[in-house]
């Protein structure tokens, strides 16, 4: 009988040890996944912020370049209907942009050591009090930078990261 008891105790110890190993392995895998997601999210924010900072360095409007601002503000600003279309942006490089609205409808796939990131930009006028999108010219423009990556998911759906910035003509 003594031999069977030792065998059963050994088997029980092996089962307990296996459960501990499975739990530890699961915890290590979860921590690694969280670390990788954190690094990718940091890259997403960096890329989006880079676009916003670059756009902020440009003129508020194509009509505000040079020494003389438009005589009618905000009516003299570029109408939304004259912002670049998706077709316009297919042939343009970011280095050619001279005004804030030039980023409208721009999109690109940027490759980094962390993978490929899809970036798209929308620029539009916003109401001066509610900051909601409007069609007429105002002294406020908003830029939305959307960044996605095939490696970042929320469940089965890809995560969409949206960075925003509101620019005021008078704050330049």
Model-based region annotation:
Residues 2-49:
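Aliphatic-rich helix starts adjacent to a transmembrane/signal segment
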Residues 42-172:
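Low-complexity, Gly/Pro-rich coil/beta segments used as flexible assembly/activation regions
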